[in-house]
Design a protein with these regions (language model features):
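Cytosolic regulatory regions of ion transport systems
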Residues: 1-141
Length: 141
């Protein structure tokens, strides 16, 4: 599978490492050159995929990262707005079917997932659910 990851922080770089170790072709876009530098991001040590530095919502940047031939796009920048824009561009302009955007704000996640039909993951909700389950489980014991 050919996967484009937008955002090369902890999640993006770790995801790239895991996908590449499983035999997938991976490209990464980040607006920070230092995030794409293995000297600054140890998870990229040995990474053989394409790294593109540029604004993730720039169509030319996305094209240079290979969005036109990718099977999946994952947007995991620190910005909900950037992630949702990348998801919309990937689906509407480039026709990518498998697109996921990380959204931190639970209220926004509901709007994007519901009204806009964009697949999202909300770490805030996942964390709260896990903590509640853990707390309630201990309460039941």
């Amino acid at each position: 599978m050919n996967v484009l990851i937008v955002g090369c922080g902890k999640v993006g770089s770790f995801l790239a490492q895991v996908l590449e170790s499983r035999g997938h072709d991976v490209s990464i876009v980040d607006k920070s050159a230092s995030a794409l530098d293995p000297a600054n991001n140890v998870r990229l040590a040995g990474f053989s995929g394409l790294c593109v530095c540029g604004e993730p919502i720039d169509l030319d940047v996305l094209r240079s990262a290979g969005i036109e031939s990718c099977d999946a796009v994952v947007a995991v920048t620190p910005s909900d707005n950037t992630n949702i824009l990348v998801a919309q561009v990937a689906t509407k302009i480039f026709g990518v079917q498998n697109v996921t955007a990380r959204i931190y704000d639970p209220a926004r996640q509901e709007v994007f997932a519901g009204q806009m039909a964009i697949h999202t993951i909300c770490p805030t909700l996942l964390t709260v659910d896990t903590l509640l389950n853990t707390a309630l489980k201990k309460e039941d014991e």
